From Swiss-Prot:
Protein name: Alpha-tubulin N-acetyltransferase 2
Keyword Mitochondrion among UniProt keywords: no
GO process terms (BP): regulation of microtubule cytoskeleton organization
Keyword set, alphabetical order: Acyltransferase, Transferase
């Protein structure tokens, strides 16, 4: 099929030449707020058509890249390469949690790298440098080196591409069919039995240029090819995920949690109530024997009993290891 007939199946886009990044949130925004002259409709048609062509070219059983899949997986994103107003290539990326064999000590480790899930350049535009332009734009936007990216079931042609342009050769075959090159583990450090993305934990820095009708906002970024010369107008940083709330051990005395009182506070309130009751009875509280308030740590040490005898150093209070009572 000729180049003209293939391109005719794709709608005309109001995007400049270069690479733009799209995820489910960005596409939904375009559909609702920026659908001038059916721009969003043509954009989604282009992604779906290139996803189908990628499936047919790789002889896959299912389509890997589509607007519906991007809406289902909000972490996935597609880099779209345009030339003369038409989409000519797609590169789908997403973070995956993988168990892979470490090349040094041959044991399974857990990693969560950014993965190439689909990579396709239209057959009419192959062997013209578009594939490298698309891949380089992704590396620039994600702030990664080529070896820090994992690939899902790469073809022989894709492996030859990585070897030719990036020198990626050595990798250990994995049971999940993901290719993780040995270079990935140069910066990888295990953390309590788990791995982390080599280099950066989240996509960090992208060079953004406002492009015609393309609106740039925090949900997505746009980049251009590596050979374009342009000024850096803005820098977007993807916010890291929020930190989990601090864990408070159950039964903790010193960290009761929000809205709860310590044992010392409860005892002191009981002491005040007892004083008020004696005043109402007409007695002089100064003549009544009232126990002095003790610290919460002493209360905990006295109430733990046998458990405290097993680990005397866990408490900061000196107590008898036999009886478990505080020493005064």
């Amino acid at each position: 099929m000729s180049s003209t007939s293939q391109v005719a199946l794709l709608p005309k886009l109001s995007l400049p030449d270069g690479v733009t990044v799209w995820d489910g949130t960005a596409l939904e925004y375009e559909r609702r707020c920026n659908n001038i002259d059916e721009h969003a409709v043509h954009l989604m048609q282009t992604i779906n058509i290139l996803g189908i062509r990628s499936k047919e070219a790789q002889c896959l059983n299912t389509v890997l890249t589509s607007v519906a899949r991007l809406r289902e997986n909000r972490q996935a994103r597609v880099y779209l390469l345009c030339q003369d107003g038409y989409g000519v290539g797609i590169l789908k990326m997403g973070v995956k949690k993988l168990f892979v064999t470490h090349p040094s000590y041959s044991s399974l480790v857990e990693i969560d790298p950014l993965c190439v899930l689909d990579f396709f350049v239209d057959t009419s535009f192959q062997r013209k440098g578009f594939g490298k332009t698309l891949f380089d734009a992704m590396l620039l936007n994600e702030g990664l080196n080529p070896g820090e990216v994992a690939i899902d079931r790469p073809s022989v042609k894709f492996l030859a591409f990585l070897r030719k342009y990036y020198g990626l050769v050595e990798y250990t075959p994995q049971s999940n069919n993901f290719v993780v090159f040995h270079r990935y583990f140069d910066k990888w450090q295990p953390q309590r039995g788990k791995g982390h993305r080599g280099g950066n934990a989240v996509p960090t820095r992208s060079i953004v240029r406002p492009q015609n009708c393309l609106r740039v906002y925090p949900e997505y970024q746009s980049t251009t090819g590596p050979n374009d010369n342009f000024e850096e107008d803005a820098t977007h940083r993807t916010p890291p995920p929020p930190l989990p709330p601090p864990l408070v051990p159950q039964g903790s005395v010193n960290s009761p949690g929000p809205g709860k009182k310590t044992a010392y506070e409860l005892q002191y309130e009981e002491y005040l109530r007892e004083q008020a009751y004696r005043r109402r009875q007409g007695g002089d509280p100064r003549l009544q024997p009232v126990p002095n308030p003790v610290s919460s740590s002493e209360i905990a040490a006295a109430s733990c009993g046998a458990r405290r005898r097993m680990s005397p150093t866990r408490s900061g209070v000196q107590y008898n290891i036999i009886s478990g009572t505080p020493e005064h």
